[in-house]
Every structure is written in C-alpha cells, then in structure tokens.
Amino acid sequence: MSRQHPTRTVAAVALAASALLASCSTQKDDDAGGGVVIESPPGVARPPYRFSARDEALLEEVQRGAFNWMWATSDPAKGVETGMCPDRTSKPTVSIAGVGFQLSGLCVGVERGWITREQGRGRAELILRSLAANPENRKAGLFYHFIDPVTAGQPADAYERVVSTIDSALLFAGVITASSYFGGDVARLGDALFRDADWRFFVAPRDAEDPQIRRFVTLGWKPEDAEAPTGKGSLLPYGWVDSGDEHRLVTFLGVCAPRETHRLDAAVYYRLRRQLGGYPGAERMVWFPWSGALFAAFFANCWIDYAGMGPDNPSAFTDLPRARVDWWENSRRTMLLHRAKAVENPLGLPGFGENGWGLSASDVEGGYAVPGLFPDALPMQALIPGSIPVRDYTEWDAKDDWGDGTIAPYAAGCCVMFDPAAAVAALRHMRGLRPGGDRSLWSDPASGGFGFQDAYNERTGWVAPDCVAIDQGPLLLAIENARTGLIWRTFHAHRFVRGGMERLGMQRTNRR
C-alpha cells in the first residue's frame, strides 16, 4: 500500500516546486513543443567509465555471478531442452523477458572469456530454434509472457496466460543483440522472429473504451480459451502511454520493425506522455506516475544507448506539447532521487542510507512486490503551455511506497550506468552484508556461486532464497555497458535498429 511521506507538508511541497520552477541551471526552456529541455549539466561524465583496479574486480565478480546463474540454470545437459534460463531459481517456467537478458548476456560471457564463442553461439541458436519451432508460444509474432522450458509452448503453471508486449520487447532486444553479435544461423533465426512481430496488431483502436490508450500499444493480448493460445482473444484494456523505460522500449522496437505493415509510426514514441516532476538535488525529470520502482529508469537503457544521445526533439514528430529529454540524464536524476530519499529514510527503516538504496520490483518475504519512490509533481500547464490533463499528464497523486523495507541489489547495481561511484559503493556494501546473521546475501562466483541473491531486508533479517532472471540479467548488462559499452554497440550495429533510429530522428552524437 502507498504511504504518505510523513516529513512533507503541503507547504513544503509547494516551496520545493517553486524552487524547481525557478531553477534553470541544468534545463532550459525551448520554443519547440512549448516545452522544457532536460539535459546534463557541464562536467557530468558518461559511460563507458574508467574504474580503479579494485572496482573493476568487484564489478567483474558481480557480473560473473549473474552470468553463472543464467548459464548453469539453462544447461541442456540438465534437462533444459530449450536452453532457456528459468524465471527464478525455484521455478523452471521460463519468462521470455529473462531470455532477452540471457541472450545478450551470452555476448558478455564470450567477451569476458567465461565461455567460448562456440558455446555462446550454440546456446543462442538452441534458444532461437526452440522459440521458432513452437507456434503456440506467440500471437501475431509477439510472445506469451511464460513458456515451458522443455517444449517452448504453454506451461502448466503460469500465473497468467497473456501475450505480453513488454516481455516480448525485452526478448527481442536480446534477440537483436545476439543476432548482431553472433551472425550466421543465430542472425537468420533471430531476424526472422523479429521480422514476424506485428506491433500494429497490439495497438488500441481509435474507439477503445479508455480514451487514454487509443492509438497506443496495449500491454498485450489474452486468448478467450487457454487451450487455444493462437485462436480468438482480445487486447488488454491497458496501454503504454507514459515514458518509463518499458514504454519507450516497446515503442522503440515497434518503430524498428522491418516490415512496414507491422511497424509503428515514429510519432507514437513521441506522443508518449512526459509528465514533469522534481526533487531537491535531482531537479526536473520526467516520471512515470504509476510506478516509482527504479527498474523503470534503466531497463531500456540496457540496450538503447541514450548515454550516446542528447535531448530528443518531439516537435519534429507531433504537435503535442512535450519536453525535450535526454533520457540518460533523466534516468540519472531518477537514481539521485532514490538515493536521496534513502538517505533521508523518513520511516527509519533499517538498512537504508547512502549505500543502502534501490527500491524496485523484487522478491519479498511475502512473495513479490513493486515498491517505489516519486518526485513532487510540477504544474504542467505552467511549465508547458497547452498541456491538458489525461492527454499530456495524469492528475494521479502518487505517494512513496517503501513496501516492507526490502532492498534489491540489482537496482542500485544497474545505476552504475548513471553514477558509477554511488553504485559501486552500494554493491561493495551489500556484498558484505549478512542480514540474517548466519546467512550471507552473496555466494562466491569463483566457486560457481551466483553473486547476489535477489533481495534482502535488514529489518527482519530475511534474504531471498532465489535469484530472478529479470534482476540478474539487467545487472549483468548494465555493468558491461558501464565498463565497455558492449551491449549498446552491438545492439545499435543491427540494421533493424539503425532503421528505427533513422525513423525516430535519433543519432548517437556522443559516440565516435
């Protein structure tokens, strides 16, 4: 349940908002779109970074642990006939989102010398052949959220049976990366799968019951009969209408579609709402009102090289009033907000502080939770004339949700792409924790261990028994991008991505 921030009064929020409105040190007004430009202040370093030998050693073992888990749990010799890693340690069912991270992670494993190129290529090819061979795992080219690890078809124990646009997007980001890296049959299989993805099929019609989602990509599709997964069904009544990382990744890949009949218009990406908020020390930012979980600031950044771009230009694609945003900088500010609020720690939760932060989707002692933190909403009509509710922003009053005080190491760790010093300090701190007294949060990768468990709670002493694919995966990729930029380079080298970038008017101007 969301909770009111106990240390903030209405007057304090108003004062903070006034200060943020007056601040223009790192953002400037721009006539295009009637909006605001969010960009980095001078002197902010961008990845890849140079790390000390000590920090490199820590990052290497964190990555190795995450890779060990994905490699060991997907071993065909142990009965995983499709070669796909499970959703979590204790559950063999596959999340296709996790497979997207896994496919990209194979590239890291080869580059780091943990597996041979032939091993990586073989595992990637097995995964893609398995996906392609079972038509009951997809509809209109996009995939069901959960699939069986042996048949790649419908699993018996999935908690939902929906074709998911975001989980398919995460899968396809990995497919494209592996295709670009390995070439050959991996590219042939992967490119064919992405070519078949019909993103337009999942767009809400102009007469959709909820006017907010009209002409935006929906969250997915559900069959009328679970026994007929490719038969009749209906789109989910929810849409990707805001500008979190998931929203942008789905829409970006839709614009990258090689078949014009399947492709989204670039304007869909720029019509996504860009609601403005702010917080002292983090300044203005675009925020997602429905989730303050930190993963919503870095999932797309695992593949899309926003660090190599500057502010975008929505006015070239839409007449709607939209701020111009450097999305890497926006994510950096979101990370600063999370860390600042952890230091403030208004509820006095044990474990939170300058090195204890990272509220995000993760396992908790009672199951699974998605806590999150939010900036203060700023007056959109004052900042961007012409803005109107619903179309351009929501009037939802989002409240900070600290959950039960559980912290997920991957959340702070992935922010190494935005603030390497803060992220490395947090990882080093968490590596040495023993929240349960006799149980460590860490298992040594040098001995085949998996690094961090999924989450921990210092108030109760609980440590998650599982590792989770969609948490281990981004940690592996984010660190690699911070160190070398490998995933960004490989993803952007693919011709489908180059085509999408051109349609979106994007350029990696910070890359040589």
Task: Locate each region found by the language model.
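C-terminal motif of bacterial Sec signal peptides marking the signal peptidase cleavage site
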Residues: 21-23
